[in-house]
Amino acid sequence: MSYVNTKEILEKASKNYYGVPALNINNLEFFHAIIEAGIEEKAPVIIETSEGALKYAGNGDQYRGAKFFVDLVKSYAESLDIPVSLHLDHGKHFDVIVKAIKAGYSSVMIDASEYPFEENLKQTAKIVEIAHSVGVSVEAELGRLVGIEDNVE
């Protein structure tokens, strides 16, 4: 298989009634474990990173960190028999989301839920426009589940 758009993985899963884990990595050990599990199960894999992971991997430079993860995931995916995608999880900063898109992420999430709904929609629409122009999928957090997220520790 190869490095694919996250939407492709999710559409196939929906059509065939199965779930796909999207797992955050913070180090190479997590990455290797997730890839090995995917290989063993012959299942697609969605690798996720946070804004903090980009900063860490890039030694303070989030674009360099995003490029590092794209290069890592793509180099592995080329030799695998399973589809693999790379997703930015809960991107809260517009500029960081754009860096992930430019670096070559399969998909990004914009989490502008801290803003009023109209501003959230405005920022989300801008990210969708940028991402879709280069074939990147977008997940958006347009609100929150009141009561459920309040006391999660």
Task: Indicate residue ranges for each PLM-predicted region.
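N-terminal amphipathic alpha-helix/helix-capping segment at the start of soluble metabolic enzymes
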Residues: M1-P21, K74
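Short, well-ordered coil/turn segments that N-cap beta-strands
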Residues: K15-G19, E41-V45, L80-V84, Y105-S106, ...
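Active-site mouth loops of central-metabolism enzymes
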Residues: Y17-L28, G58-N59, D81-K92, E149-E153
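Active-site beta-loop-alpha junctions enriched in small/polar residues
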Residues: N26-L28, S50-L54, D89-H93, S113-Y115, ...
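Active-site-adjacent beta->alpha loops and helix N-cap segments on the catalytic face
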Residues: Y3, A66-K67, H90-I97, S113-E139
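Hydrophobic faces of well-ordered beta-strands that scaffold small-molecule active sites
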Residues: V20-N24, V45-T49, V84-D89, V108-I110, ...
